[in-house]
């Protein structure tokens, strides 16, 4: 079977099957973990002007070993059952890797959101939510959607309002969906979460001197060059945070209209501002060389230390894998590297940080938002002022004991209590760092495990298996 004929779901299962022998689990249990438990296909009408349009939509719940299930909703003309099943499976493994207590799920609506005005999109979204309610496929203890490609906080607010309308007695209704606006029980830091998680994951990978030496790089992320393909939410935040907090030099950026390249570095904030002012195009940007749409895929082949594909799946395949010149590939998108390309890149000693770990920042902060909704209180409200007062007292004692005054600037920095955004970022950093260390430990301790992706699957499979074995089989 050629690479082009292998479905996305089959590709995910191929990776699963490659990792399964390293778990020593019985075949029946592995089959249960791998299977999609529930697949819902919906066709519902929406009135648009004087006409009716039938909308094709899906919701897949891959695994019920933990509840609720969790996964985003994407709006795209390319949505199909196989894709949604694959993404739901990846969500199960992703949640297990980062110790988020959800089963995996995913939703999709087969439309191009850019073809509709806001009023029509609201109709489509609210009716989709109603279809989920009718099938008992949404709720804070059942299945919790989130944003994905083509959706955002606006759509999540519509979903929340629709669910709340039909579940008036559910005091935890806000927990039915995450990625909501902050004004509608959202959490600070959710918008940047996936991109920030990508940065934390890549930074942790670069912190191991032995691994960096193997690919001819020095320890640490600072000073490394990066190319980012895709300037959506994930790609833009990854680039901005990597530049601002990691000291990374962005040398190439690609999008649907083409790409820009400057080996001396590109100011990502300046580039994003230019593209916004230039009707969504890089063309004419003075800080780099622009290459048009027909050359856009060449951005993946630019020389760099770190390549971040942050758009769609299968962009790195057997046709271009030999031309990839990066030392590290950070899979910010879902499934950007095909299994055939992975084998080629492995032979070339290129490190691939797998998607099921690297883009888990979104579901991690969604978990924080869900917890906030169930507790009905923002993070930091109870302890912020207490911690500030304790810190001020400690500074006063320090000044008295040393006879030296702390500057007002230092006092403000040291004494400040953690706000919600600080706690969210800290929790995300801890999650990504500890998860990478678990994956690397499995990889390092088992020389027969070929790569980080296989190690990540081993970690995920073992954690899910432990849940199934602890729960038993009913009846």
Enumerate the language-model features and the residues they cover.
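Short, Gly/Pro- and small/polar-rich lid/capping loops
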Residues: 2-41
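Rossmann-like adenosine-cofactor binding region
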Residues: 258-352
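Flexible, glycine/charged-enriched surface loops at secondary-structure junctions
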Residues: 26-32, 99, 137-146, 171-173, ...
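Glycine-rich, N-terminal phosphate-binding loop and its surrounding beta-alpha-beta segment
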Residues: 41-49, 54-113
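Glycine-rich phosphate/diphosphate-binding loop of Rossmann-like nucleotide-binding domains
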Residues: 181, 185, 189-301
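Glycine/serine-rich phosphate-binding loop and adjoining beta1-alpha1 elements at the start
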Residues: 76, 96-222
């Amino acid at each position: 079977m050629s690479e082009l004929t292998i479905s996305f779901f089959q590709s995910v299962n191929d990776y699963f099957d490659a990792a399964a022998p390293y778990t020593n689990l019985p075949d029946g249990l592995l089959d249960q973990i791998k299977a999609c438990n529930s697949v819902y296909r919906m066709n519902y009408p929406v009135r648009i002007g004087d006409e009716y349009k039938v909308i094709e939509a899906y919701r897949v719940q891959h695994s019920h070993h933990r509840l609720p299930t969790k996964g985003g909703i994407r709006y795209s003309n390319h949505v199909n059952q196989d894709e949604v099943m694959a993404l739901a499976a990846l969500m199960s493994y992703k949640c297990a890797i980062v110790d988020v207590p959800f089963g995996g799920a995913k939703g999709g609506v087969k439309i191009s959101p850019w073809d509709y005005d806001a009023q029509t999109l609201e109709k489509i979204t609210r009716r989709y939510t109603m279809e989920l309610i009718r099938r008992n496929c949404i709720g804070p203890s059942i299945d919790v959607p989130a944003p994905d490609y083509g959706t955002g906080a606006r759509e999540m607010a519509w979903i929340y309002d629709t669910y709340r309308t039909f579940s008036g007695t559910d005091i935890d209704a806000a927990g039915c969906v995450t990625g909501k606006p902050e004004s509608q029980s959202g959490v600070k830091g959710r918008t940047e979460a996936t991109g920030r998680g990508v940065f934390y994951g890549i930074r942790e990978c670069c912190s191991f001197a032995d691994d960096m030496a193997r690919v001819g790089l020095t320890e640490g992320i600072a000073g490394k060059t990066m190319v980012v393909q895709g300037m959506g939410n994930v790609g833009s935040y990854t680039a901005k945070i990597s530049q601002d907090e990691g000291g990374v030099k962005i040398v190439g950026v690609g999008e649907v209209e083409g790409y820009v390249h400057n080996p001396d570095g590109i100011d990502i904030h300046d580039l994003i501002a230019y593209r916004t002012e230039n009707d969504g195009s890089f063309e004419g940007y003075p800080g780099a060389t622009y290459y048009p749409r027909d050359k856009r895929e060449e951005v993946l082949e630019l020389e760099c230390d770190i390549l971040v594909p942050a758009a769609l799946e299968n962009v790195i395949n057997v046709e271009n894998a030999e031309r990839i010149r990066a030392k590290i590939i950070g899979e910010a998108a879902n499934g950007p590297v095909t299994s055939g390309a992975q084998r080629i890149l492995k032979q070339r000693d290129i490190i691939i940080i797998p998607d099921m770990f690297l883009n888990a920042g979104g579901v991690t902060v969604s978990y924080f938002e869900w917890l906030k909704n169930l507790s009905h209180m923002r993070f930091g409200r109870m302890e912020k002022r207490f911690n500030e007062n304790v810190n001020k007292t400690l500074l006063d004692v320090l000044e008295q004991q040393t006879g030296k005054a702390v500057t007002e600037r230092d006092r403000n920095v040291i004494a400040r209590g953690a706000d919600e955004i600080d706690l969210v970022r800290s929790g995300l950093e801890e999650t990504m760092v500890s998860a990478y260390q678990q994956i690397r430990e499995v990889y390092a301790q088992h020389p027969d495990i070929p790569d980080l992706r296989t190690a990540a699957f081993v970690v995920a499979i073992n954690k899910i298996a432990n849940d199934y074995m602890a729960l038993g089989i009913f009846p």
